[in-house]
């Protein structure tokens, strides 16, 4: 089968764990492969639960540089969208839910996290973004070593899985979704505001294939919905190196 032209194929990437180590900058060899091997062959986009500033830091650039470098940059699950270097669309969870509901959710999370005993706790337990509320039991200001320590304990004890279950039990009919993302946190957002949200920005682009690459593709992970959506061809990866290996095979690079 002949290759489709670049304008008809999109490679769409989660960031943490897919193109970069969690919350770390992209490796130079991964970046060179994406820019020199992949971009000449297909259109390339990013979709992340993080805000644009964090995405840009991980992509080793300023926000302006990164939105110009990629065909599409969907930060905060696509609630903030840039197409070909230009701002396109923005939604607000605060306007959607209202202040009372936002505070009800935040207060529950703070109380729940206050009763957890962990090896360490640091700062920024709740981060309010345009498209979601991010809650972090260990605190987002933890060091890299503390992050890894929490991730190891979480893998054994299911700290975030239990937290997610408590949220689902407390807010069963709220219209909210709760997804485990990255190594240390949970994303809270209105149902349908998961990473699939970015697909509405692609409906008129004429793509015949949208390949999505993510690492949190199991049910409950923040890549699951987009990975399993019938509009995408989902690829589950285990590391940036695995992402490159799969890209080489899929696109014959």
Residue ranges, per PLM feature:
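A generic structural motif
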Residues: 39-43, 173-177, 208, 230-232
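Mg2+-dependent phosphoryl-transfer enzymes with acidic/Ser/Thr/Gly-rich catalytic loops
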Residues: 2-7, 26-27, 189-253
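Conserved acidic, metal-coordinating active-site core of Asp-based
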Residues: 119-211
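Short loop/turn segments at strand-loop or loop-helix junctions that form parts
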Residues: 11-16, 76-78, 84-85, 129, ...
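Asp-based phosphoryl-transfer active-site loop
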Residues: 4-25, 46, 73, 199, ...
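A short, Lys/Arg-enriched amphipathic alpha-helix followed by its capping loop at the start of a domain
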Residues: 5-12, 29-42, 170, 205, ...
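Substrate-recognition element of Asp-dependent hydrolases with the DxDx(T/V) motif
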Residues: 37-59, 73, 125-137, 180-182, ...
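Active-site phosphate-binding/coordination module
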Residues: 25-124
């Amino acid at each position: 089968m002949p290759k489709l032209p670049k304008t008809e194929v999109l490679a769409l990437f989660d960031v943490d764990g897919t193109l970069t180590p969690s919350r770390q900058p992209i490796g130079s060899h991964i970046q060179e492969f994406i820019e020199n091997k992949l971009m000449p062959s297909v259109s390339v986009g990013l979709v992340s639960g993080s805000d644009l500033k964090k995405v840009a830091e991980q992509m080793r650039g300023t926000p302006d540089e990164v939105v110009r470098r990629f065909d599409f940059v969907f930060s905060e699950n696509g609630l903030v969208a840039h197409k070909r270097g230009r701002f396109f669309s923005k939604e607000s969870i605060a306007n959607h839910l209202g202040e009372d509901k936002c505070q009800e959710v935040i207060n529950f999370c703070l109380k729940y996290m206050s009763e957890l005993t962990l090896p360490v706790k640091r700062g920024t337990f709740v981060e309010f973004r345009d498209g979601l509320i991010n809650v972090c039991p260990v605190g987002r200001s933890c060091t890299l070593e503390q992050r890894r320590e929490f991730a190891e304990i979480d893998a054994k004890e299911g700290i975030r899985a239990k937290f997610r279950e408590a949220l689902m039990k407390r807010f069963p009919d709220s219209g909210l979704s709760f997804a485990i993302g990255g190594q240390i946190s949970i994303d809270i957002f209105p149902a349908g505001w998961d990473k699939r949200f970015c697909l509405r920005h692609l409906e008129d682009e004429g793509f015949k294939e949208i390949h999505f690459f993510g690492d949190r593709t199991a049910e409950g992970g923040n890549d699951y919905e987009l990975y399993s959506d019938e509009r995408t061809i989902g690829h589950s990866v285990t590391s940036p190196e695995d992402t490159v290996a799969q890209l080489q095979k899929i696109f014959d690079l």
